[in-house]
C-alpha cells in the first residue's frame, strides 16, 4: 500500500500540507508552522486567532487594526505618502455589504451612553451594551444574554434578582431603586456632556 499524497496546499507557503501537519482554520489549510499573524508573525493556534477576508491575525493585532481604522481593512496605518501634483482619480465603486457593517455605528450603550462598536456589542431586548457594561447592577457580576433578568431597564444576574425579590417579597423596592439608578445615570451623562463642551 502506498501513500499517494494530498492535494491540499498551505495558504501561507503554497506547499503541500500532509495530514500530520495540517491545521484548518475557516476551511483554509495551513502547515502548523505557517499559521502566523500576518502583522507580527507570531505563531497562532485555533484558540487565539481572528481572521478577516482570509487574512489571519493574533487577537491583539486584529483588535488594534479595528480600533485604528474603525473598519476591518486588511492594512494597518502606513506612514503618510508624499503629496503629488496629480489629482486623485475618482473611484466609482460602491462599498460591499460587509464594509457597511463596519463603517461606524450610531448604537449607544444603554448603561454608559457611549458608542458601541460591533466587535464589543451585546444586544438584548433591543438595547445595546458594551460587553464590559453588560453586568449585574447589584453586584457587578458578569452576565450573559442567556443568564440575566431586567426590571425597568436595569440589569441583574438571576441570582441577585431572585435574592432581592425574596428580601421584600415584591418588586416594588427594585422598581424604586431602578428609577433612582436611571436618574443618577442620566445626571452623570448630562454632567459629562456639559463638561465636554468648551467654554467660548
Swiss-Prot record:
The keyword rRNA-binding does not apply. Residues 8-68, 107-167 form the LIM zinc-binding domain. It comes from the Eukaryota. SUPFAM superfamilies: Glucocorticoid receptor-like (DNA-binding domain) (SSF57716). Keywords: Actin-binding, Cytoplasm, Cytoskeleton, LIM domain, Metal-binding, Repeat, Zinc. GO terms for molecular function: actin filament binding; metal ion binding. Expressed in roots, leaves, stems, flowers and siliques. Barely detected in pollen. SMART domains: LIM. GO terms for cellular component: cytoplasm; cytoskeleton. Gene3D superfamilies: Cysteine Rich Protein (2.10.110.10). It is found in: Cytoplasm, Cytoskeleton. One of its GO terms (biological process) is actin filament bundle assembly. InterPro entries: Znf_LIM. The keyword Repressor does not apply. Its main location: cytoplasm. Cross-links actin with a constant of dissociation of 0.4 uM. Binds to actin filaments and promotes cross-linking into thick bundles. Has an actin-stabilizing activity. The actin regulatory activities are not regulated by pH and [Ca(2+)]. PANTHER family: OS06G0237300 PROTEIN. Interacts with F-actin. This is LIM domain-containing protein WLIM2a. The lineage of its organism: Eukaryota, Viridiplantae, Streptophyta, Embryophyta, Tracheophyta.
